[in-house]
Each structure stands twice: as C-alpha cells, then as structure tokens.
Amino acid sequence: MLRVPLLVLCLALSVGADYYGYGWGRNGGGGGSGGGSGSSRASASASASARANSIGNLVGRLTSLVDASASARASASANAGGFGGSGAGGSGGNGFGGGSGGSGFGGGSGGSGFGGGSGGSGFGGGSGGSGFGGGSGGSGFGGGSGGSGFGGASASASAQALASATAELQAAQDAYDQASAYAEATARAAANGGSLDSSALASAIASAEASVSARGASIIARARARAEATVRAARRSFASAQASAEASVSAVRSAEGRARSFARAVARARASARAAIAGVRSSGRAFASATARARASVSAAARAVARARAQAVARARASIRASASASARASASAAAEARAAAYARVQVAAAAAARAAASAASASASASASGSSFGSGGSGGSGNGGFGSFGASANAVANAFAQAFGGGLGNGGNGGNGNGGNGGNGGNGNGGNGGNGNGGNGGNGNGGNGGNGGNGNGGNGGNGNGGNGRNGNGGNGRNGNGGNGGNGNGRNGRGGRYYYGSSDYYY
C-alpha cells in the first residue's frame, strides 16, 4: 500500500538533490561555480549528502517494512486460503483446503472444498466459500465479513485490527510527509540563497525515522503475533475439523455397517416370512386334504351305517315274518290238536252221558221223594248247555255230566235246587256257569263249583241259597280266564285259578 508513494517520494528527493547540486542521491553533488561561497557550499554539500544518506537509509527501512508487510500478507493469505491452495492474491482451486486469496494484505477468496472458502479484500481476509468448514466470511488470515471460516477470527476483530494497522501506517506516512516537506522547503530556501537549518532538518528526519521505525516494528510485531496466533488457531481448527471429519467418516461407516446389518436382518426376516407363509400354505393344503379325507370317511361311514341299518331292518322283518309264520303254524297246530282233544272228550262225554241217563232215570223217583227237582240243562253245544243237579243224591253223576257236556261251545248249565252242581268245563268259549243250589232243610248249601274253562273263560261259580252258603270255587281256567266265584248268602266265593303249564296263579 505504501510502496508506490514512498518510491515516488525517494525518486523526487534524489532528482531534486541532483538538480540543486547538493549531492543528495546517487549522483552526488557536481559542485557549483563561483568563488566566494566555495567552502560554505562544500560544507553544505557534505551536510546535504549526509542527510541524503540518512533519508536513503530511512527509505530503505520503509522499503524493508513494506516488504515485510508484503511477506506477512503473503503468509496470511496462504494461511487464509487453507492447506493446498494458492498464495496471496491468487485464486485457490477446489480441493481439500484450497481457496482463492483476494486483494489486500492477507485476504483472498477461498474456493470450494473441504475447508476452504473465499477471502475478501483487506488485511485479514474476506468471505469464505463453500465447503466443509468454509462459508461466507469463513477462511482468511483473521476472519472476514460474514460467517466464521476454517480458522479465522470474527469479522469485527479483523476489522478492528485492520483499522488499527491502517491508522498507524497512516500516522507514519504523515510524519514522513511532514519531514519530506520540511526538507524540500529547506532545500529550496538554501537554493535561493537562504540559510539552511541543518539541525532542525536532522531533528525532523530523525524524528520521522524513529516514528516510522517504531510504528512499523510495532505493526510488524503485532501482525506477526496475530499471524502466529491465527496459524495456531487454524491448525487447531484444522485438527478439530479433521477429527470431526474422521469421526463423521467413522460414523458414516458405522451407519453404513448398521444399514447393511439392518438390510441383512430385513432380508432374513423376509426369508423367514416367506418360509412361514409357505408353511402356512402347505398347512392349509394339508388341512384341506385332511378335511376332505375326513368328510369322505364320514360319508362312507354314514353309507355303511345306512346299509347296516337297512340290512338289520330287513333281517328283523324277515325274522318277524318267520317267527310270526312259525307261531301261526304252531297256533294252528295247537288249535287243531285242541279241537281233536275236545272232539275226543265230547265222544267220551257222550258215552258217559248215555250211561248217566240210565242212572238218572232209575234215580228220579228217589230224587222226587227227597224234594229235589230235576233241572234241565241247555244245549251243551251252542247255548247254556249241560245238565243241572239231580239232587243231593245225584251230585257225582251231575258233576260228571256237567264236566262232559256243560260247556262244549257255550256256558255251563245252571244247577238245580238243592246242592248246586259243578259247572261244566268250558270249551273254546266261556265256561259254564255253576248251578244255583238251594240249601237243604237246615243243611249248609254248598255253592256249585265253576266249570273248568276250555280255551275260553272258566265258568262262574253257582250261588248257594239256603243255609250258611259257602263260597263257590271258580272254575279252573285252561287257556282262558278262570271263572268268577259264586255269590252265597254268606261269604263271597273265591276266584278261579289260571293254569300256565304246571304252575298255579290265584287271584
């Protein structure tokens, strides 16, 4: 910033010294013509040459200061641009930490990359570019306008440092300008024949030199310290960013590993789900097949049960038909046998009746004398057949006749007066009723015995009238029901008996 004005000033002083003949600068003094003032001019020339040398030394120091500032600016620009970027003022390429340095003491624009950014013009950098750690106002020597950079300070601190350095340089330049103006005025006065205040000029030059040297050294020291601090901060920031980047990379790799593990787990879960679905489907098919087989088995069992039931019903019907026909045949044969037996008994009874008739004819006179009456029996075949009692003396004959003919096809005849006779045996119909016997004179009249039932019901016992009537005995039932006991004047008659084979049943 100060290089061009200082060089112009030094060139002007050197040319002026050569022009006025004071021996300042490179050419020295050529001396002057004239006689009287030779010694004074020689001393003035020597003094001016010494001053010119001092001014040259001052200019050299200022030039060194400017060069040091340029070197510091280059270093700051290199630090601001990042690692791997271009130098001060140049444009940094895209890369790990590069960026383009802009115009100014140490700033520049950093390019896009891992840690770079664009630095603006000025003492300590400008806006940072895009990248991992860059951004607007990111990278630079001491920070720039905008956001924070890779290793830079804040924009306000950089601006304050830049303003302070600029003010100090401006004060040094003002002091040097004042010294230069005073030297020119003194030189012009001496050239015009005036006196030269060498002590004042030397004092001004020394003061300017001291001021410029002190302030330049202070600026350089502060700039160096600030640059070193910035470099250390940048290195720490870079180390932190590198650690963060490595942590991020490791996190990304870990996330990728977890993602791959998750993908493998998802794949295994999908495979398991597919296997489970396949198992469920196969189980469903097996269940459907088992259900179909069970239904077929149930249908076959139902058909077998239906066939067995039909066969059992058919066998039962056939057995019932066979047993019914057998029982019918047995009943028919039994009925035929019963009819044959009854016919035989009728024949035997007829013979006995013939014999009894003869006996009855002979005994009728004695029967009339004893007060007995002859009871006429009904027809034994179809009505109330059989004979009644022939009196007390003819009970045996009457009983035999009644048993033979009393109930062939109908009921037994009624007993005559006196001791009632026994009812005839019942045939296929109902047994004959016992005759009603009248009690004898003062005797106990016995009720007639009911006839023996044939295939039908037994005859009813006769009712005994007269004295103390006894209970008539009911007829003995054969295939039918026993006859009812006769009613006496005394006790009731006893019921007949059922014959079932060889066993008796009384009621």
UniProtKB/Swiss-Prot annotation:
Main location: secreted
Compositional bias per record (Gly residues), positions renumbered to this chain: 462-498
Keyword entries, A-Z: Coiled coil, Secreted, Signal
Coiled-coil regions listed: 158-185
Ranges where the record places region Disordered: 462-507
Assigned GO CC terms: extracellular region
Tissue: Component of the acid-soluble and acid-insoluble organic matrix of calcified shell layers (at protein level).
Keyword check for Signal: yes
Protein name: Glycine, alanine and asparagine-rich protein
